[in-house]
């Protein structure tokens, strides 16, 4: 019988924040394009070490409303917001990221910032 390692208690785990964003551009973008744009923005602005510390993680994207959610370490929220604000082009098309809000849970983020875009 294999023994599994103990899980970390909540006090020792990394704390995350979730950022709701909207993409405004010349055309509609796919999930993969947005995922790549977030990662490239993080790497170009924060660098490899900064991106590793911020731990940006793409959660969800609604292609119809062009809104989405990205997870980030709580100490680096403002850095990722800054990186997203610097995006001007996605795959050669003009586009910008508009940050709608930040929350500690996905449920509250959807209720507070994304409900007007049809998220449930």
Swiss-Prot record:
Catalytic activity field: Endonucleolytic cleavage of RNA, removing 5'-extranucleotides from tRNA precursor
Protein's organism: Thermococcus onnurineus (strain NA1)
HAMAP family tied to this protein: RNase_P_2
GO-annotated molecular function: ribonuclease P activity
Membership in a protein family: Belongs to the eukaryotic/archaeal RNase P protein component 2 family.
Protein's recorded name: Ribonuclease P protein component 2
Major localization listed first in the record, in broad terms: cytoplasm
InterPro entries: Pop5/Rpp14/Rnp2-like, Rnp2-like_sf, Rnp2_archaea
Function (record text): Part of ribonuclease P, a protein complex that generates mature tRNA molecules by cleaving their 5'-ends.
Oligomer and partners: Consists of a catalytic RNA component and at least 4-5 protein subunits.
GO annotations of cellular component type: cytoplasm; ribonuclease P complex
Domain of life: Archaea
SUPFAM superfamilies: Rnp2-like
EC numbers, comma separated: 3.1.26.5
Localization (cell): Cytoplasm
GO biological process: tRNA 5'-leader removal
NCBIfam families in alphabetical order: PRK03717.1
Keywords, comma-separated and alphabetical: Cytoplasm, Endonuclease, Hydrolase, Nuclease, tRNA processing
